[in-house]
Amino acid sequence: RRLGTAFLVITHDMKLAADLGGRTVVLYDGHVEEAGDTRALLDHPRHPYTRGLLQSAVGLNPVRDMWGIRPTTVSYTRQPHGCPFYGRCTQSLPDCAAHAPELETQPDGRLLACNRGGVLTLLECRGLRKSFGRQRVLDGIDLTLYSGEIVSLVGRSGAGKTTLARTLAGLLPLEGDGAVEFQGEAADFAALHRRLGGVQMVLQDSQAALNPRMTVRAAVEEPMRLSGCLREGAAERALEDVGLFACDSFLTRRIHALSGGQRQRVAVARALAMEPALLLADEPTSMLDPSGKANLLRMLKGLQNSRGFSMLFITHDLDSALKISDRIFRLEGGKLARLDPNDHIRVHFNGLFDAV
């Protein structure tokens, strides 16, 4: 700056780009995917590839587990005019394989090349309020969930975390002028629970959530049967996805004969069989031992990373939230506040190096 010299840095190091500031251009396969003010790109990436790079950057996320962008899911030679990121993008449409997006200027001044306008807004709620008697539990909650991210909600017991999750799932009615939109339209909760690509919920107590007299197969297939979307082999695939053997002896076992960890995985398989765009997970690990908790969280994060669904993770356990979340909010006094744990961590890292 003192010499007035332009400085062009070509790097894979996202932390270096963040430290240098200025402007950043994101390239993929020789194409500009996104370009703009560095701080704006870091705080709110609009292209799925930019977001994937930031989520993979250890220097920017010193606590979170490393999860790279998924490998390509299609075996094809990309058409000359198709989107270069199509095979790795979790929100791509068939049309993206044939038509490359134009690099267009966005309202905030950045450049973006995406046929879908960038990372999609999946769910948006405005002014959510909920009271039980004279006690106001939710007091004007505003929250936006984007496609392909994990948002964690932490707070004390009784803070209203489950109430918020059940309201977003349509299990509790909206009050006053509160509104919930799903994929840009007013949420029709009955329809969202009964279609593929909608909203599913995993409850804290799998023993209460699953009929103990049902077989494993019947429990996993039940929502698909009720929705008229049962596909051959869907139950087996869902069980294998969550690490359970989909053999006949297990499929015919009664729910009451399963261990706690197995029941919770069956509950997750039941939800994932509906291929949800949004999974609401309310304390899914609270009844598991440390090993079971770690295995279930890594399984959920792995599936989310490869399939691209969004997840709202309700938990008391901030340490677990730090490992898997893209954003974390604390619910207290009926209000949401975003947490930035990296600020605290950077302070302690700096103190550690100062002591050496």
Predicted regions and their residues:
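P-loop NTP-binding/switch modules centered on Walker-like glycine-rich loops
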Residues: 1-63, 292-356
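Charged, flexible cofactor/metal-binding loops and thiol motifs
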Residues: 37-121, 340-356
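ABC ATPase NBD coupling module
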Residues: 40-45, 76-80, 186-200, 214, ...
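Conserved structural motif at the start of ABC-family nucleotide-binding domains
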Residues: 123, 138-140
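Conserved ABC ATPase "signature" region
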Residues: 232-249
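Conserved ABC ATPase signature
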Residues: 254-258, 262
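Catalytic Walker B motif of ABC-type/P-loop ATPase nucleotide-binding domains
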Residues: 279-282
